[in-house]
């Protein structure tokens, strides 16, 4: 077991106490050193995953929420979200009708701490929340993309301020 994986497992124990769940280990796919996944089912269902390939940690999230709507609007929304996000990138699979998010962190000379990894996970879930709220405003309320994202950002900020 490599050092970064040990740190992840320590974090997962803390997440179980704090957040009530623990990511499950899955068989690594080709070139993966390890793979952990979890599913969140609230209003929207999201599959999250952390894998390490060589000296990179990959954090991913996949959802089908809103993916069957107008493809052009989805692509415009994802393009807009990608334009201001300094972590990660959203992509869309028209074949599978899935929205995907991925962020990559290099770990060549060091291991990330539990706190840093938790922050990466928190950031990923926050960006997925921004996608969900923005898409809801666009597809269910006919609000233009820029206005929808701005409103969603404000709403998320209010939540974290409380």
Name the predicted role of every residue range.
Residues 32-34, 57, 97-99:
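Hydrophobic residues embedded in beta-strands of well-ordered beta-sheets
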Residues 26, 51-53, 92-93:
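Short beta-strand micro-motifs enriched in acidic
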Residues 136-162:
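Short, highly charged C-terminal tails/helix-capping segments
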Residues 38-66:
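Long, continuous compositionally biased terminal/linker segments
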Residues 3-7, 66-74, 116, 120-123:
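Short amphipathic alpha-helical segments
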Residues 90-142:
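Charged, low-complexity intrinsically disordered regions
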Residues 62-98:
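Short, internal acidic amphipathic alpha-helical interface segments
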Residues 1-47:
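Charge-rich, low-complexity N-terminal segments
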């Amino acid at each position: 077991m490599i050092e970064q994986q040990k740190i992840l497992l320590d974090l997962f124990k803390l997440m179980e106490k704090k957040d009530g769940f623990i990511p499950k280990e899955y068989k690594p796919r080709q070139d993966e050193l390890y793979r952990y996944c979890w599913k969140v089912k609230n209003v929207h269902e999201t599959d999250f995953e952390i894998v390490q390939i060589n000296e990179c940690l990959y954090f991913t999230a996949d959802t089908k929420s809103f993916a069957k709507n107008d493809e052009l609007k989805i692509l415009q929304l994802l393009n807009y979200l990608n334009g201001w996000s300094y972590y990660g990138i959203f992509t869309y699979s028209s074949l599978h009708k899935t929205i995907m998010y991925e962020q990559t962190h290099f770990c060549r000379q060091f291991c990330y701490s539990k706190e840093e990894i938790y922050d990466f996970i928190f950031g990923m879930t926050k960006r997925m929340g921004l996608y969900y709220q923005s898409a809801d405003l666009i597809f269910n309320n006919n609000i233009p993309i820029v206005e929808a994202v701005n409103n969603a950002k404000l709403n998320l900020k209010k939540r974290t301020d409380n």
